[in-house]
Amino acid sequence: MTALAAVPDLQDAAGPSTTTVHSPNYSGSPADISSSPTTRAVSRNTARQTASAPPNHAESSPPGNASPTGPPSPSGNNVSPHGRHQGMSKLRACLVIATLSGVSFLNTMGSGILTVSLPTMARDVRLDDSLLLWPASVYSLAAGCTLLVFGAVGHIIGPKRVWITGACLYAAFTLGVGRSATGSQLIAFRSVLGVSIAMCLPTAVSLTTNGFGAGRWRNMAFAFQGMGQPLGYSTGLILGGIFTDTVGWRFGFYISGGINAVLAICALVVLPSPPRHDEGDGEQREVEEEATDATVAAAAVNRSSRSRPLISRLAHDVDWTGTLAISASMGFLSYVFSVVSKDYDRMAAPQNIALLVAAALLLPTFTLWVGRQERLDRPALIPNSLWRKAAFSSTCAAVFFTWAVFNAFQYFSALYFERIEHITALQTSLRFLPMVLVGAATNIVTGYLVETVEVRWLVVVSAIFSLFSPLIMALVRPGWGYWKGAFFAMLLSPLHPDVLFTVSNLIISRVYDGRSQSLAGAVFNAVSQVGNSVGLGLTAVVSSAVARSYHGSGGVGNAMDPPTGRPQHLPSSPTVEATLAGYHAAFWLMFGAAALVTVITFLGLRRGGKVGAVE
């Protein structure tokens, strides 16, 4: 909170500022709102029917979750040069950021508790060994399959409603996890938690961009949300280890659920309501004053769309076919790679092959469908024209590979500490503390630097530093000790992911117009979620294959057996060497992917500009 309160908030001494519309022009030059592909996809057919009609200002009453007394929209004189509403106090702005970042923190805190406590949890709820990893897997699967759905729904009914609903459900079912008496209850509650967090993650982007104008406050809001993830996971690891050995693992979920309930109540009061219907994204009104044909048509589209009943808008203003097609493809991919990460022999199972084929076929189907939607001027989830923008396409590719590497790096590092160095889960969690501290500092510094430093150099330099993390772990030997090897890998690993989190949210949110920010958040989170699953699955296949070939068929087992929370005294030195060889191979694969990210961002962000600067 202290760091947030220190954000400068200078008054605009030069008079009224000119605020332009978010656009895919990343160098910061102004662009008309009609340049947004998402706006164009919805506009022309409806505009033909409504542009000639006189404006009906009676239709501009606030929606259900809008408040006439809420903070003004981020336009013109209502926003300070650093992006904070002049009608919003610093305390309230800090509470908004803390609330949104808090759920991001609790999301990964639960995963950290689960990672350390899973063996004890499985014993207490009598979870079958064949289902041991399902409490973790179903959470990711449920979230990955519904992120885009709730991003689209939040675009229509309002991000604040969807976010608060998700936060309330997350609080309730986190407590449910703590009260689970059977394995089936544990898996079911974790599934609902995945759906609940899918309501919060994409809409948090919309609440951030609509709640803060372009500038330092928006940058810091994204930075603190990024900081919440590593802090939450590491806190979960530490608390999970402590609680499991003392008062019991259930206490960790009770604490998490209680904090979440407080955040949900706080959100009702402090979160900004969406702009009024006739204001669009809050920045459109200034553009409309220019009275160009395009902006008049866009305004007419907005009035016509908002005047229809909610059910009609949900039915016609959401690309349901595209949403379901890409969500199913991501769900199939995530499921198969989740299964394969536990036992790569299951890749040959007929049902997994069928799901992979279905996922592969759905991708070109989705591309053809959204292309058709664009040609017919209908809503398209991710218009194909966006992929022709180097900043957008390279950012999505970087997010995919970065989250694939970072997720796999954390998991394999934990395996290395427990299975090769034979230390406890609590000792393992303490070895991740440098990652947490550096990650927190990186997010705060990035929130300031995105205003003044070219995004290309921020991302590329951080990628080069983080490149050394998997390289060190690919070479490390148990005899090195923690301080000569793994310590430096932990220090460097969060630099690039935490820089990219802030930068990518700023870039992707600029591609979508202000009314579609929930979709922007859904795109980012969906890409990162698939990256998590694919990265862990592929590294698991490589690790297990190398371990088996190293030791023949004589007893290595699966190199991806999950941490048990206890020291793993392996039966023989050859087995340890085989397992270590598998881990090294996985880290080499991560190194290759991280190097690819460096090249992608260097080439793709040449015209990235300063994405955090006030336009």
Swiss-Prot record:
> Which GO terms of the molecular function aspect are on file?
transmembrane transporter activity
Q: Name one GO cellular component term.
A: membrane
| Localisation | Membrane
User: What main location does UniProt list?
Assistant: membrane
Q: What does this protein do?
A: MFS-type transporter; part of the gene cluster that mediates the biosynthesis of pyriculol and pyriculariol, two heptaketides that induce lesion formation upon application on rice leaves but are dispensable for pathogenicity. With the ABC transporter ABC7, is most likely responsible for pyriculol and pyriculariol secretion and thereby may contribute to intrinsic resistance.
Sequence segments annotated as region (Disordered):
1-85
Query: What does the record say about its membrane topology?
Result: Multi-pass membrane protein
- What parts of the sequence cross the membrane? 94-114, 138-158, 162-182, 192-212, 222-242, 251-271, 320-340, 351-371, 397-417, 432-452, 455-475, 488-508, 522-542, 585-605
* One Pfam family it belongs to: MFS_1
Organism expressing this protein natively: Pyricularia oryzae (strain 70-15 / ATCC MYA-4617 / FGSC 8958) (Rice blast fungus)
Protein family membership: Belongs to the major facilitator superfamily. EmrB family.
Q: Give a yes or no for keyword Membrane in this entry.
A: yes
Q: Where is the composition biased (Polar residues)?
A: 16-53
Listed name of the protein: MFS-type transporter 1
| Source organism superkingdom | Eukaryota
Keywords recorded for this protein, A-Z: Glycoprotein, Membrane, Transmembrane, Transmembrane helix, Transport
Positions annotated with a glycan in the UniProt record: N25, N302
